[in-house]
Regions:
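Signature of Asx- and small-polar-rich beta-strand/turn repeats characteristic
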Residues: 1-317, 321, 325
């Protein structure tokens, strides 16, 4: 009795072709055929290549479905989503500085000078220019002689500045769809710097601030939280709750803004000198901020590597707020 099956799981092209020859030669319809002839040999080549490629695709697909064998970042990102683990994004490099202002020559000096978030500083690392900026409001009080030393809202004199470009992505919600995802086409987001706000209408000034799910301490049907995570394509998407799971979401007619830093990662580490981009205007006069570096820039990093994701997934419990320890 002739062979009725072909072993197509082998990935070796020659072995597949030989299996085809054996199979066909045992069929009554092909008993007198010369399978080494150029015509039949070419047909067998096509069949063998097709089987070979299908076998490779099947093996690749299976390998990419498992944590231990996946090789593509997109596969590991998808596996991470299944247990609620959010791979780390790029991280902004940060420096620490002291800021002061000398208004000794100014008449009618104000008691307090306040600077909004986003004060920018230029620096150079290994010949490449970077921009760092504050991420919170800072203020300084006259010491009685016209010298102002800036502190944070917590009265801390060491002020953190972060590398990156301030970016805002706006979404006008036209329809409320369950589990809707909004794409942010930027692979350089530092998700820790994101600020998410929802406005009642596109022209509203009042807003509700949503909290990163990783930082939420409790969840109810009315919680305002968001999830900002990497997609298999490498960009990012933001999702909200559905009034039952993970709280509520923006509704049709709302406007959602996502402010974040688009960063350079590790290459911005090591900056030593920070020069203010702009002067400070007080009583219609311009003054230059005085900067003292407390710490060279540090902490910038690229996206979490696939091997780190793999290791973290092995030791992370299935909770959206968990991160690798």
């Amino acid at each position: 009795m002739g062979q009725t099956t072909i072993k197509s799981t082998a990935l070796d092209f020659t072995a597949i072709k030989n299996n085809l020859k054996v199979f066909l030669s045992q069929q009554d319809e092909f008993t007198d055929y010369n399978f080494e002839a150029s015509g039949l040999s070419s047909v067998l080549d096509v069949l063998a290549y097709n089987t070979h490629y299908n076998g490779l695709i099947a093996n690749f697909a299976l390998n990419e479905s498992y944590l231990g064998t996946a090789q593509l970042r997109s596969s590991l990102v998808s596996l991470a989503e299944g247990i609620g683990y959010i791979p780390d994004s790029m991280n902004a490099s940060q420096g620490i500085i002291n800021l002061s202002l000398n208004l000794e020559s100014l008449a009618n000096r104000p008691t307090v000078v306040t600077l909004a978030s986003g004060v920018k500083f230029d620096t150079v690392v290994d010949g490449t220019s970077y921009v760092f900026q504050t991420q919170e409001e800072i203020s300084a009080r006259d010491n009685g002689s016209g010298s102002y030393s800036f502190t944070t809202a917590d009265n801390v004199a060491d002020i953190k500045i972060f590398e990156g470009t301030s970016t805002t992505k706006t979404f006008n919600i036209t329809a409320q769809t369950e589990n809707a995802a909004y794409i942010i086409p930027d692979e350089k987001i530092d998700i820790d710097t994101a600020i998410v706000r929802s406005f009642e209408t596109p022209s509203s000034t009042a807003f509700t601030t949503f909290t990163d799910l990783r930082k939420a301490t409790s969840l109810t049907s009315t919680s305002t939280v968001y999830i900002l995570k990497e997609t298999p394509k490498g960009e990012y998407e933001i999702t909200f709750g559905n009034k039952t799971v993970l709280g509520r979401s923006p509704v049709a007619g709302n406007k959602v803004t996502v402010e974040y830093l688009s960063v350079s990662g590790e290459t911005a580490n090591g900056a030593k000198v920070f020069t203010p981009q702009n002067t400070v205007t007080v009583n219609s006069q311009n003054f230059t901020l005085q900067v003292s570096t407390v710490s060279n820039s540090f902490g910038g990093s690229d996206k979490e590597t696939i091997e780190s994701i793999r290791t973290c997934l092995l030791y992370t419990s299935p909770s959206p707020r968990d991160q690798c320890l």
